[in-house]
Amino acid sequence: MHTMTTLLKKMNEQEKLVMLTAYDYPSAKLAESAGVDLILVGDSLGMVVLGYDSTIPVTMEDMLHHSKAVRRGAQHTFVVVDMPFASYHGDFDRTLQAASRLFQEGRADAIKLEGAGDVLQTIERLTQVGMPCVAHLGLTPQSVGVLEGYKVQGKSLEAAETLLQDSLAAERAGAKMLVLECVPHQLAKRIAEELTIPVIGIGAGADVDGQVLVYHDVLKYGVDRLPKFVQAYADLNEVATDAIRSYVEETKNGHFPQERHTFTMDESLLDSLYGGK
């Protein structure tokens, strides 16, 4: 069973941390059996499994539904759950109630919040009441409208300095971990060197403390285009499509089901069912 203590021990021993998204029982079960260190129940589920064009429509009920399923499939893995869009801005009591549900009902080990500024104050307050938080900086999908699309962040001197300072502020606020998304690898390396908490990269190069990728991207399952930073380790699109096509063809041509797929009963019972001959 991984805890923040065991994860920090791995980091301090220079062992890379591996995080993978999972959105349901079977994906979580496979991820745990494969040996990932952390599972992220990301609001990316909105696009990957619910068919939305962004993470914005994802609700708290969506996150709870999927996090419960993931925990049932991965009972011994550290699970981080995203706070969905607009659930942690404004009134803190409302934020606290939402966060509490992810821990109590969703059985999260930590929750992830995107952004800096007021978000870091929220992280600090949640940490003070005993709720472990993960910060998410760089490309933050919930703010993609403000960021003018899915672009690499921190490429200018001013943007890089802001990102570095925000990362340091996230650690000071009490964040237990930082996810850096779509950041130049040189900047990500500098940030990882400055922080004492694990820095998990996605599109942030190799010189951070660990990596996170989306389950469906790693398996090329149900996705058409992969981001530049993704390495697919299988092509389940092809495998699954071929398998389903075979099922369709064999059903239509009468090759399925065969005798080995069927059940039998005593013919005399069948006769009795119809009142005999």
Swiss-Prot record:
Q: Name one Pfam family in it.
A: Pantoate_transf
Gene Ontology molecular functions: 3-methyl-2-oxobutanoate hydroxymethyltransferase activity; magnesium ion binding
Q: Which residues form the active site?
A: E181 (proton acceptor)
**Cited CDD domains:** KPHMT-like
Which cofactors must be present for this protein to function? Mg(2+)
Q: Which UniProt keywords apply?
A: Cytoplasm, Magnesium, Metal-binding, Pantothenate biosynthesis, Transferase
* Statement: the UniProt record of this protein carries the keyword Metal-binding: yes
Q: Which Gene3D superfamilies match?
A: Phosphoenolpyruvate-binding domains
Record field: catalytic activity = 3-methyl-2-oxobutanoate + (6R)-5,10-methylene-5,6,7,8-tetrahydrofolate + H2O = 2-dehydropantoate + (6S)-5,6,7,8-tetrahydrofolate
Q: Which GO biological process annotations does it have?
A: pantothenate biosynthetic process
Localization: Cytoplasm
Q: What is its main location?
A: cytoplasm
The record's remark on the cofactor is: Binds 1 Mg(2+) ion per subunit.
Q: Which pathway does the protein contribute to?
A: Cofactor biosynthesis; (R)-pantothenate biosynthesis; (R)-pantoate from 3-methyl-2-oxobutanoate: step 1/2
The family classification in the record reads: Belongs to the PanB family.
Protein's job: Catalyzes the reversible reaction in which hydroxymethyl group from 5,10-methylenetetrahydrofolate is transferred onto alpha-ketoisovalerate to form ketopantoate.
Q: Which NCBIfam families match?
A: panB, PRK00311.1
Note the subunit structure. Answer: Homodecamer; pentamer of dimers.
Tell me what this protein is called: 3-methyl-2-oxobutanoate hydroxymethyltransferase
Origin organism is: Exiguobacterium sp. (strain ATCC BAA-1283 / AT1b)
